[in-house]
C-alpha cells in the first residue's frame, strides 16, 4: 500500500496552488532523473501527494483549448471579479470558485500503474462512488472525460465534475473539479470544456440544498484510497 501525503489547502489563489503543484511535481521529476543518472547510488524516494482546495473565481484554459471559449474580455473578467490563466493541463476551459472541491493528485504513477487512461478512469470512479453516497447516480459520458448525470439521455446529460491532468515522467499534476455548492452562473461566461450543447450541474442543484463539503471530501478520500490502494497521511 502506497503512502500519499494529504493536505487541505482551503481557499487558495489559483496561481499560488499552481506554483505549489509545479514545485512538488518538479521535485519528484528531478529525483527520478537523478536516480536514473546514478543507478548504482542509493535511490531517493519520490513523494506522492493529494491536495484539496477551493479557489476564488477563476477561469483556466488547458493547452488544447481555444480562447474563443472564454466569453469575457479583460473588463468583463473584472466585472465578475474573476481571473484567467492559460495553463499546462489537458482539456479546454473550465471555471473554479468557492463551493467547488478541487483535487490535485501529484502521484508518481511508477508506484501505482503507468497508464494515464486508467488513472483518469480511477479519478472518475472515485467521484462516481462519492456521488452515489449522496444519492446521486452518475457515470461517464461517451467521448468525454469527467463525471456526468443522465448519461443515457443526450438531451439531459450534464457535467458535475471536470477533469484535466498533466503527466511528466509519470508524475501527475492538476486533477478534478467537483461542483458541490458552486455558483453555476459563472459557467455562463464560458463554453465549458469547449462543449456548447451540454449543461453543468452541482450536488447542491441536484439535491436542492447545500452539502457539507467536509463530508464530500471524506468520501472522496475514502474512495481514493480504495481505488489506488493508498494510505493517506496528513501532511
Regions found by a protein language model. Give the residues of each.
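Proline-centered turn/helix-capping motifs that create local helix->coil transitions or kinks
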Residues: 138-139, 183-185
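Conserved phosphate/anionic-ligand binding catalytic regions in large, soluble enzymes, centered on
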Residues: 94, 168-182
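C-terminal accessory segment of soluble enzyme catalytic cores
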Residues: 148, 184-235
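N-terminal lobe of the biotin/lipoate ligase/transferase fold
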Residues: 1-157, 167, 211
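Histidine/acidic-rich helix-loop-helix segments that form or flank divalent-metal centers
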Residues: 160-163
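Solvent-exposed residues in well-ordered beta-strands and their adjoining turns
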Residues: 108-110, 166, 179-181, 206
